[in-house]
Amino acid sequence: MVWALGLMSGTSLDGVDAALIETDGVRIGRIGPSLTVPYSPELRGRTRELLDRAAGLAPDDAEVLAVTRELTLRHVDAVRLLREKAPGLEPAVIGFHGQTILHQPERGRSWQIGDARLLQDLCGVPVVHDFRSRDLENGGEGAPLVPVFHAALLHQEVRPVAVLNIGGVANVTVLGQQEPNGQRGVWACDTGPGNALLDDWALQHTGQPCDFGGALAASGAVHQDVLERLLAIPYFARPMPKSLDRLSFHPEAMACVRDLSAADGAATLASFTVEAVAGTTFPVRPEGWFVAGGGRHNPVLMDGLNHRLGNVASVDVLGWDGDALEAQCFGLLAMRFLRGLPSSWPGTTGVRQPCIAGRAV
């Protein structure tokens, strides 16, 4: 096994997560340290503006190029700081996801900005990037890619279980009952909104980047009629696998809640996230749910999930770092690329056949 360094900047647009894991691409050995380099308010704002306009932008747009460079330099900072934090754990490879500004699987397109060559040149470590393109080219959704990592972490768990990641978008990995030969089914999809709608609502009404501790949602009431309109969006009737962009049905959802008070809107949007998960049909019924991502810190979401699903806990009870999982995942995916191992399957992304993810610089 070798040390791999994974980098992830998610749809919450809060910064760059960097993490070290020891892996051969199949097994996970030691879990190294991790850290987050936050985006400045200015960089977050510029990135959000690109995200809002991405469908009409060209890769050589001046602002795209400028933000790409700034984001890449934040990733360089993250690598430098993590190497300083763990001087004896030198990475053999970096898995670089980049910042998603557009995800349109129905058009075969997913756009992550970031300069992999600049990152490799400044860090002096081989970089693997562009993890979604090949899956899309082979009929897949290009997301989610984390199931192979969840399966590796839970290789000793024999029950059917689910790992729910609540970032800007919520995605779930469902692992079937483990057979005596060690084989098990793996399925995945984006269930619906995670924190993105709540974050945008909180920013609009309180000036804060998120609903800290779920306080705003906890003080409000769910408007059932509005919730029913939100859940009638056609995406929720589609079978898995399926995936979303951060702004999928964003205007429609915000229009539904615009006349509500700040507290009631937050409560209704939180319930939207919960009900989208609870309403997703899986091939097997999970006996346990483990929640990762920023959403696990929101008591309103966690209480709602426990009420609807039962047996829901934070991944922290497993000893995992729920804020570093996706960064750790891209360390594993980079090693799988180097070994020629697939990272997506028909049950996880809808790809036609098992597919290797990534590309070397």
Curated annotation (Swiss-Prot):
InterPro entries: Anhydro_N_Ac-Mur_kinase, ATPase_NBD. One of its GO terms (biological process) is 1,6-anhydro-N-acetyl-beta-muramic acid catabolic process. It catalyses: 1,6-anhydro-N-acetyl-beta-muramate + ATP + H2O = N-acetyl-D-muramate 6-phosphate + ADP + H(+). Coiled coil: none annotated. One of its GO terms (molecular function) is kinase activity. Its EC number is 2.7.1.170. Keywords: ATP-binding, Carbohydrate metabolism, Kinase, Nucleotide-binding, Transferase. Pathway: Amino-sugar metabolism; 1,6-anhydro-N-acetylmuramate degradation; Cell wall biogenesis; peptidoglycan recycling. Pfam families: AnmK. ATP binds at G10, T11, S12, L13, D14, G15, V16, D17. Catalyzes the specific phosphorylation of 1,6-anhydro-N-acetylmuramic acid (anhMurNAc) with the simultaneous cleavage of the 1,6-anhydro ring, generating MurNAc-6-P. Is required for the utilization of anhMurNAc either imported from the medium or derived from its own cell wall murein, and thus plays a role in cell wall recycling. NCBIfam families: PRK09585.1-5. Belongs to the anhydro-N-acetylmuramic acid kinase family. This is Anhydro-N-acetylmuramic acid kinase. The gene is anmK.
